[in-house]
Amino acid sequence: MIWHVQNENFILDSTRIFMKAFHLLLFQGSSIFPECILIFGLILLLMIDSTSDQKDRPWFYFISSTSLVISITALLFRWREEPIISFSGNFQTNNFNEIFQFLILLCSTLCIPLSVEYIECTEMAITEFLLFVLTATLGGMFLCGANDLITIFVAPECFSLCSYLLSGYTKRDLRSNEATMKYLLMGGASSSILVHGFSWLYGSSGGEIELQEIVNGLINTQMYNSPGISIALISITVGLGFKLSPAPFHQWTPDVYEGSPTPVVAFLSVTSKVAASASATRILDIPFYFSSNEWHLLLEILAILSMILGNLLAITQTSMKRMLAYSSIGQIGYVIIGIIVGDSNDGYASMITYMLFYISMNLGTFACIVLFGLRTGTDNIRDYAGLYTKDPFLALSLALCLLSLGGLPPLAGFFGKLYLFWCGWQAGLYLLVSIGLLTSVLSIYYYLKIIKLLMTGRNQEITPYVRNYRRSPLRSNNSIELSMTVCVIASTIPGISMNPILAIAQDTLF
């Protein structure tokens, strides 16, 4: 009799929970419609994988890419709508969040074509790879719209877990296994530190978890200048630091870049920074409104260390992927300038514009590395010598992307940095901008060193890898070259038509 009553109570409770979830999706599901499209794509992938054989691989790529494109379309149709807070305050939809969601979807859409030939050559499981990429994208999108501490913690964990699995996807590679272990341990430690900071915020605000309610709670409890808030600020900055990977929280980055599969590195190098930047902007700007001077100082220190150490250490690298790892550390220092400037002086607009260009520059570079690695089997910078004599298109594409990363005019990277530094200068960040200019000049040195190797025609300098260089006969080659071409064009053309891009960013945000 007791068991029967308990069973009935369980059924009633389950029914109530299901009905509440259905009610939320029915009346507030429009706020997460792009995310729902990705979830539908994930379910469809699983269904097709369980009922088909390996001959249906093209369908897996088609479903993944189509769900991403439809999600982007749904996001664009919702552009410039009024801000919406849904799901009992857990999720917020506004122009600022949607821009970052668009950038994450764009990254994933460009990364999938980079993976086609690599997966075929390495014989990796295609379905699981695409599932992890789409799930990580989903976690990044939810993180951009997260409006409470619980969602801000769960969403990046969804992204991080998929990132750990992707970085160790080539299980037979010892370097990949080592990279995964370091990434997992560092990520777990950073998450625990982040939660520790959240607990101080939660307690100091009187038990509030929504970002704006935390501010009101701190005012009511008069704890906004307490030591607990300082502890929360330091803990959250450290936790977010491991996600953004500025110096000195960059220890995992070079090893993960070098050991992980190259398409995975391309994906992580941009999506993780976009999602973490969106999260850092909201967490620091809203709950720590009364401690703006303190977190500005912390971020200034991180930006200076990142720009100097990242570019100095990149000079000494012999591996292309390790060089790009240290270069990305320097790049995040530039992005932090936009976070510090904030709403005033178009700081956010300059940061978003530079991130858009960084996506095209970085993914274009990685597309070239994927092609060269598949055709030669090496990642050593020295082995790129003389590539222009064998494959002029690949060599020129890589050279353009590297020059754009360095910030040479009239490429997109130059105008992105110019706008970012100009906004920083107007906000009074003279030291940061000066260091940014000097380190940008320094970065041009090691990029030009690689370009010099690419263009060399001396036989004694050309390595056996380039002498035996052969184009791959696989048709899937076209998808990598298509993605590479799109990124190269995006890295050069926007420099000529900069004003419309800036106008769109400013009009959307303000």
From Swiss-Prot:
GO terms for cellular component: chloroplast thylakoid membrane. It is found in: Plastid, Chloroplast thylakoid membrane. It catalyses: a plastoquinone + NADH + (n+1) H(+)(in) = a plastoquinol + NAD(+) + n H(+)(out); a plastoquinone + NADPH + (n+1) H(+)(in) = a plastoquinol + NADP(+) + n H(+)(out). The keyword ATP-binding does not apply. GO terms for molecular function: NADH dehydrogenase (ubiquinone) activity; quinone binding. Belongs to the complex I subunit 2 family. NDH shuttles electrons from NAD(P)H:plastoquinone, via FMN and iron-sulfur (Fe-S) centers, to quinones in the photosynthetic chain and possibly in a chloroplast respiratory chain. The immediate electron acceptor for the enzyme in this species is believed to be plastoquinone. Couples the redox reaction to proton translocation, and thus conserves the redox energy in a proton gradient. HAMAP family: NDH1_NuoN_1. This is NAD(P)H-quinone oxidoreductase subunit 2 A, chloroplastic. It comes from Agrostis stolonifera.
